[in-house]
Amino acid sequence: MSDQSNQKELLWQSRFSEPFDREALKFSSSVHVDGLLYREDIQGSIAHATMLGEQGIISKEEAGQIVTGLKAVEKEIESGELTPVWEDEDIHTVIENRLKELIGPTAGKLHSGRSRNDQVATDTRLYLRRNIDRIGELLKAMQSTLLDKAEQYKHTIMFGYTHLQRAQPISAGHYYMAWHSMFGRDAQRLADLRKRANISPLGAAAFAGSTLPLDPARSAELLEFDGVFTNSIDAVSDRDLVIEFVSACSMIMMHLSRFSEDVILWSSAEFNYLSISDAFATGSSIMPQKKNADIAELVRGKTGRVYGNLMNLLTIMKGLPLSYNRDMQEDKPPLFDTAETTASSLSVFRRMIEKTWLNEERLARLTAEDLSLATEIAEYLVKKQIPFRDAHRITGKIVAYAIEQGKTLPTISLDEYRTFSEAFDEGIYDDLKPDASVNSKKTAGSCSFKSVEEQIARAKAAR
């Protein structure tokens, strides 16, 4: 039988005739998770108490007492002097109980006109805002590192790939600027989300509002929100913002995972395009020669974890009637895990990329000898007024011939080229150089050195 002795009184317990079962309390306790919200909870409570005092719902002296007490509780939590235990049920209870011990019965006035429903919704939005800003700064740092890499390698020729097959020569700077664009969209998504998250739900109470003369706009102002809720039911029952945040983080992790895949492949002996600093690689416990791209592999693996968090949240919310339901307590583990996983992945991956370098000599040798210049032959023929489909067919036959003869495209003689089409002349050899191929691209946003330099300049100007 569960032991009910020495159980702390819970904030909602007065209506019940017997104590809450201890096993049920332990099962439902969230303090081990939502303890992370103590700063946000105290921040929201200080704003609420200040507003209560200004509105005359409590005296200004009482409001001052509460604010001073809350700041003391925050210091105790930060110093480790106050350690929550599962019997406290949640972080809101921990803080209010300790506040009562410090300032006495006045602590009971803090919750005037407030429910844990709008309280936790406020805490969550404050947490989202802080982590949106945190991850946004990490994305800016990532973009800055990618700009440096693009600048460093803007005149380095490498392969561009489709289907993981060598496709066409490109500027390596163009490759790094592609990632810069992707992480830029991630930052835009978060900035857009921040606008929706920065609306205060405080004052919605349980879900129907309050009969007390609250001033939700003042609470919002104190918490630096941009506005207040327009529907009290929506204010406490909505978790769209949490789902949207985890979705945005899933996109970030997807980009990191794809980038990781390139790092893993390119640093392998089979590719040997990229070298990773020893500071960001690991070895084997049995094979002394190994140098593994473990950081990239871990980032790739953690992506699945964040995807799982997104499905977790969608599944929690899909069948809930309005307004608040206790199921929604379970949004915190996937939210917190996603924020920490995304932030740590961005931080360590950026530092790893900073300490990588391209093997330029190998790339120069491989691109000069490869069949990836075939598209240049097709476009050369198009410029000679041959329809593209015919040019493509002719070029395909030339590629097959080169493979059969063991030749590279630049080493095929003009007489050999002319057996495929009379349109060929000496000018074909000007196009069969990797740098000429890259710099012949004329479209905006292409891989030419000029275009890449323009991309870099625009990105620097936008910082």
UniProtKB/Swiss-Prot annotation:
GO terms for biological process: arginine biosynthetic process via ornithine; L-arginine biosynthetic process. Coiled coil: none annotated. InterPro entries: Arg_succ_lyase_C, Argininosuccinate_lyase, Fumarase/histidase_N, Fumarate_lyase_CS, Fumarate_lyase_fam, Fumarate_lyase_N, L-Aspartase-like. It is an enzyme of class 4 (lyase). One of its GO terms (cellular component) is cytosol. It catalyses: 2-(N(omega)-L-arginino)succinate = fumarate + L-arginine. This is Argininosuccinate lyase.
